[in-house]
Design a protein with these regions (language model features):
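Cleavable N-terminal signal peptides
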Residues: 17-18, 29-31
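Acidic, serine/threonine-rich low-complexity disordered tracts
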Residues: 32-147, 192-303
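Membrane-interface motif at the C-terminal end of an N-terminal transmembrane signal
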Residues: 23-29
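Bacterial N-terminal signal peptides
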Residues: 13-23
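Bacterial N-terminal signal peptides that target proteins for export
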Residues: 3-15
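A charged, solvent-exposed segment within the mature domains of Sec-exported extracytoplasmic proteins
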Residues: 137-201
Length: 303
């Protein structure tokens, strides 16, 4: 089988957008207190929409992904950790079972190296790396961001051989927020207060001529129609729509939908009309915390 340059697969279609909205239990400080065990998934005893972003260190989100009649066809994990005084985040996704067999057990690894900005409120990536393993073949992309010179460099390798590199200017007063930076910054209110009816435009790393993601939290009237169609009862939930150009993820509409708890944790995520597969679904399985998260990326070569 010959290796083709990376094209986003259905698993990552869900994860890239889902990273915008995973919002968990927030408080000041750098650690998580004990949480009551009787709360439903997606709700926490205490919630605040902003604070020191380093409070997320040690957190891992576990996600199950299904499509058609294949339940839990793939899994994903998102985590934040500190090592030697530097803060990193990783996203890992891989297919399993029969779907894994069909996709050569495809695996995606993302890693961001962060600087802490704005008095601890925002992360800004100095490096963003992506590695894809399909069977025995690998592709890796590195992005370097220098905000002193306002320059973005990128390098792409296939099986250890460089096949592409380039650079572009970073506009002043703009941050190229990769998916992991967006993940934590959105949770911390960097892009604006989270309210029903609100719209957001988020600058991201340019790819295929696209450098922005559009986000809309539906207003109560819009949400009511969807609640009726899907038999949902909780009016405190949020329904979020993300529009990503359909060419990026090979969908018919480019539309991604998220049902979120009142604490902004996605309960269900849907990629609409993925070509040949129909709708794809992701669900939050659980959240764990561990102050010693220093694993995973070294073993796949993202150092």
């Amino acid at each position: 089988m010959s290796f083709k340059p990376l094209e986003p697969n259905p698993i990552l279609a869900i994860l890239l957008a889902g990273a915008l909205f995973f919002s968990l239990f927030l408080r000041d400080g750098h650690s998580f207190p004990s949480e009551p065990t009787n709360l439903p998934l997606g709700e926490y005893a205490t919630f605040q929409p902003d604070g020191d972003i380093r409070r997320f260190i040690g957190e891992t989100l576990h996600i199950d992904i299904s499509f058609l009649w294949f339940e839990n066809a793939a899994t994903a994990r998102v985590r934040l950790y500190e090592q030697d005084g530097v803060i990193y985040s990783t996203l890992e996704a891989e297919t399993s079972g029969f779907v894994g067999f069909l996709t050569d057990y495809r695996k995606h690894y993302y890693k961001a190296t962060f600087d802490i900005m704005d008095n601890g409120k925002r992360v800004r990536s100095r490096k963003f790396e992506r590695k894809v393993i399909i069977g025995g073949q690998e592709e890796q992309t590195r992005n370097i961001f220098d905000y002193d010179t306002h320059t973005h460099w990128w390098y792409r390798e296939v099986d250890g051989k460089q096949i592409e590199n380039g650079s572009r200017d970073i506009p002043r007063n703009v941050c190229f927020d990769d998916i992991l930076a967006v993940f934590y910054n959105f949770r911390n209110g960097i892009y604006g207060k989270v309210d029903k009816g609100t719209r957001y435009t988020i600058h991201t790393v340019p790819e295929k001529g696209v450098d922005k993601i559009q986000v809309h939290i539906m207003n109560p009237s819009e949400q009511r129609d969807f609640m009726s169609q899907e038999g949902r009862k909780n009016r405190e939930e949020f329904l979020l729509k993300v529009i990503i150009p359909k060419e990026i993820f090979h969908t018919k509409t480019g539309e991604l939908l998220f049902w979120s708890s009142k604490h902004l944790i996605p309960l269900e995520t849907t990629v609409k009309d993925y070509i040949l597969l129909g709708d794809l679904h992701a669900k939050l399985n659980r959240r764990t915390t561990d102050d010693s998260l220093k694993i995973s990326t070294e073993k796949v070569g993202l150092k």
